[in-house]
């Protein structure tokens, strides 16, 4: 009797055809009624994915109140139920003819399995010819909440036709939106459906009409149109993007990205993806012929991919190219200098990791993307770069070596002529009609050079239950081979083969105390963790060494325990200093959560530190404050969880020498119901060279649920120093069981000149179907920390872990 269930998978695939267009993102169904549109049937087996996988091997049980007819023409009457695994078919009457293969199921026909439910008035067909007809259908997709109806379904083998069907994820009694199609042809063998004259309705109003479209009904990808994206901005005008998906093969595909901008013209783009065992990649290209605003062709190419050579080695590449220095500003909407950079990085390399070692060979190149700057602002290219790191314990000792060899090159720079003032003596008026001119006058000719950096070390990490003591001795040798152009560039002395060699000694020690205590009726574990770090590095004159990739670290609590002030190998500071620091934590004993943490520390300098990065040949390296005998700024970090909703944090640096604060950062966060959040932050940094204010900003952002359906979003990011906003976002969100609408108005700084731009973003999300408009999630997730609540619990990358693509010989365990 298993044969009688042969029709069941076919109506299932027909009804699922429209929901196969659903978006990949999870949706919030919390506003939906608790009762399913089509509740489960009495007597049906419980949902069981394992039973669904085994259904073809399980027997079919048939039962009913009465059985009549003959052995070849059985007739079941009253509460007929057919069960196999997770499948259930119920009807009032079932007549079968085992010789001809005909069957008829009438009266309250019901079908259910793990993921699908359906009711119909009648089902009839022939098992031998595999033809079936089901009339007056209502269905529900259990996991997606998708539901709808159809007047009838005709099936012939793997091919079927659905007549006068609908689909929605809304409650059937109040469908805010639904898709109607008078006819849908489905080919289960090929995995696609074809709808004719389909209409998307919002309420009873048709908003989109599709005379013909083809779509997948299973996981197999199909060529076709994706939902469009559109927006409006002062920079590009009306902006419309229509993605066209091309399913080229099971392991690679492409998406055409034609884009129309009313102020610029048509841009042609494409995205190609490939996947194979051991690797994958993606390349995106865009081309805009004769930009109407810039009067020239524009374009970009981006590629990223990797290949696993074996279990230890992986090849990776990331390549970026744009046609001109205005491209990033014109075709992206991030904050220049805040959400994006003034340059693009391209890297190609192979990287290895073993139990005690990491290694890599790579090449890196930079491209300028800020039209207000010249090539002097670019970092040096590393072409190529090889590194090897090794560390291993030997009894109570640990030994290791950090090694790097790099060839540095740099593009020559040319003067950029800024716009002229409109009135003599007036500040530059840099509106959209002003033009920066890249001249042919060479500003600086850069040479090239190679660097070898070796840093072997041995340490003796000792520890107990309440203490640790780790002395470390390292030797650092750095040698260069420079071309004549670079060697003769001041302040270098002309030596083409300078070198530096010096020892580095340190002792890191700490204690751990804890006690059980109680405060306001809550039990805590209170810790006290004093720490001492002594560092000695003798002075070496390094004025004849170039500066390629070295910058001063930003002074922070972590900097108190490093053996150098610099990120790279071009400088190694001399030091005779002692760090004294302490941390105290209050941990709730019932759940282990940290109620309060306080950390404070200071460096005592026993002598002047004579090595600096000042007056280097590299403009990007910047400058730093000299360090004299005495004390560093106090560094204090604090985090306080007022309650489970409200938390505060602060970082403060006070300099006893200038009797001023070097840095202050205050932040607070309050979690609201329904995933709401309020963030408030203040940031201040002082320029340690001229004692001026370097940065002074306030940042306020929120996601405020007005009620379960409506919420307001916003951000006000303001520079107190410049007395102007950096970004303003205001918007509303409306959410329901099956539809979400988001609208944003955004004003933001778009370039280094401080010019502002405006944009309007609107997105419609038809839950369980798709979304169209601009991707507002990306904007809000960047602007409002906690817009996705899970983002609050992501662990930031540690600055003490080894990144295979970021050699740093200054990090010694």
Swiss-Prot record:
Biological processes annotated in GO: Gram-negative-bacterium-type cell outer membrane assembly; lipopolysaccharide transport
Location of the protein in the cell: Cell outer membrane
Pfam families associated with the record: LptD (PF04453), LptD_N (PF03968)
Disulphide linkage map: none
Signal peptide as annotated in the record: 1-22
One cellular-component annotation, GO: cell outer membrane
Assigned keywords, A-Z: Cell outer membrane, Membrane, Signal
Gene3D superfamilies associated with the record: Lipopolysaccharide (LPS) transport protein A like domain
Family in the record: Belongs to the LptD family.
Function of the molecule: Together with LptE, is involved in the assembly of lipopolysaccharide (LPS) at the surface of the outer membrane.
Quaternary state and interactors: Component of the lipopolysaccharide transport and assembly complex. Interacts with LptE and LptA.
Xref: HAMAP family: LPS_assembly_LptD (MF_01411)
Protein name: LPS-assembly protein LptD
Species, as recorded: Xanthomonas oryzae pv. oryzae (strain MAFF 311018)
């Amino acid at each position: 009797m298993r044969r009688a269930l042969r029709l069941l998978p076919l109506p299932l695939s027909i009804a699922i055809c429209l929901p196969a267009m659903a978006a990949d993102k999870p949706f919030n169904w919390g506003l939906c009624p608790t009762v399913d549109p089509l509740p489960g049937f009495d007597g049906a087996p419980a949902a069981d994915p394992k039973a669904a996988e085994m259904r073809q091997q399980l027997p079919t049980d048939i039962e009913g109140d009465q059985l009549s007819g003959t052995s070849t023409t059985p007739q079941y009457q009253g509460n007929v139920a057919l069960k196999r695994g997770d499948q259930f078919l119920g009807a009032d009457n079932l007549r079968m003819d085992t010789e001809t293969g005909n069957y008829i199921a009438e009266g309250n026909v019901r079908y259910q399995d793990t993921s699908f439910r359906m009711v119909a008035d009648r089902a009839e067909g022939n098992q031998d010819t595999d033809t079936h007809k089901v009339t007056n259908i209502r269905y529900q997709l259990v996991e997606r909440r998708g539901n709808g109806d159809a007047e009838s379904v005709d099936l012939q083998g793997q091919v079927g036709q659905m007549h006068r069907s609908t689909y929605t994820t809304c409650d059937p009694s109040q469908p805010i939106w639904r898709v109607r199609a008078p006819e849908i042809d489905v080919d289960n063998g090929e995995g696609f459906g074809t709808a004719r004259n389909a209409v998307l309705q919002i309420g009873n109003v048709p908003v989109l009409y599709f005379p013909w479209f083809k779509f997948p009904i299973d996981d197999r990808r199909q060529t076709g149109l994706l939902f469009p994206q559109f927006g409006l901005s002062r920079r590009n005008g009306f902006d419309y993007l229509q993605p066209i998906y091309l399913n080229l093969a099971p392991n690679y595909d492409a998406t055409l990205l034609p884009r129309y901008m009313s102020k610029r013209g048509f841009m042609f783009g494409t995205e190609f993806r490939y996947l194979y065992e051991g690797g994958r990649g993606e390349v995106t290209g865009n081309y805009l012929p004769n930009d109407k605003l810039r009067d020239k062709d524009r374009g970009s190419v981006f590629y990223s991919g990797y290949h696993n050579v074996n279990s230890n080695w992986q090849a990776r590449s990331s390549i970026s190219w744009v046609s001109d220095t205005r491209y990033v500003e014109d075709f992206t909407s991030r904050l220049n200098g805040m959400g994006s950079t003034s340059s693009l990085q391209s890297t190609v390399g192979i990287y290895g990791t073993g139990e005690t070692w990491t290694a890599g060979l790579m090449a890196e190149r930079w491209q300028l993307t800020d039209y207000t700057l010249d090539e002097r602002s670019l970092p040096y290219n590393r072409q190529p770069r090889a590194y090897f790191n090794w560390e291993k314990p030997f009894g109570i000792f640990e030994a290791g070596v950090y090694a790097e060899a790099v060839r540095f090159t740099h593009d020559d720079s040319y003067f950029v002529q800024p716009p002229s003032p409109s009135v003599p003596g007036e500040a530059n008026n840099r509106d959209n009609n002003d033009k920066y001119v890249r001249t042919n006058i060479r500003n600086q000719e850069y040479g090239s050079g190679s660097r070898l950096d070796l840093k072997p070390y041995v340490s003796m990490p000792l520890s107990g239950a309440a203490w640790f003591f780790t002395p470390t001795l390292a030797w650092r040798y750095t040698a260069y081979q420079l071309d004549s152009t670079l060697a003769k560039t001041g302040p270098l002395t002309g030596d083409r083969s300078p070198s530096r060699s010096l020892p580095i000694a340190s002792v890191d020690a700490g204690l751990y105390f804890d006690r059980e205590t109680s405060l306001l009726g809550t039990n805590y574990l209170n810790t006290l963790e004093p720490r001492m770090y002594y560092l000695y590095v003798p002075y070496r004159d390094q004025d004849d060494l170039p500066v390629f990739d070295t910058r001063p670290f930003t002074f922070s609590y972590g900097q108190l325990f490093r053996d150098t002030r610099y990120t790279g190998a071009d400088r190694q500071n001399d030091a005779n200093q002692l760090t004294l620091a302490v941390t105290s934590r209050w941990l709730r004993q019932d759940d282990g959560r940290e109620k309060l943490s306080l950390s404070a520390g200071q460096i005592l300098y026993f002598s002047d530190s004579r090595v600096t990065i000042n007056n280097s040949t590299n403009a990007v390296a910047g400058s730093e404050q000299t360090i004299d005998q005495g004390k560093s700024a106090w560094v204090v970090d604090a985090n306080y969880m007022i309650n489970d909703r409200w938390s505060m944090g602060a970082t403060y640096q006070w300099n006893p020498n200038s009797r001023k604060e070097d840095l202050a950062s205050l932040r607070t966060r309050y979690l609201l119901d329904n995933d709401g959040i309020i963030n408030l932050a203040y940031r201040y940094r002082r320029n340690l060279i001229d004692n001026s204010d370097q940065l002074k900003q306030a940042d306020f952002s929120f996601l405020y649920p007005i009620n379960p359906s409506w919420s307001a979003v916003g951000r006000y990011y303001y520079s107190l120093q410049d007395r102007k906003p950096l970004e303003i976002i205001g918007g509303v969100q409306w959410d329901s069981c099956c539809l979400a609408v988001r609208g944003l108005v955004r004003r933001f700084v778009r370039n280094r000149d401080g010019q502002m731009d405006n944009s309007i973003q609107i997105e419609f999300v038809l839950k369980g179907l798709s979304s169209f408009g601009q991707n507002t999630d990306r904007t809000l997730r960047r602007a409002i920390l906690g817009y996705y609540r899970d983002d609050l619990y992501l662990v930031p990358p540690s600055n003490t872990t080894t990144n295979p693509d970021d050699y740093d010989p200054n990090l010694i365990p």
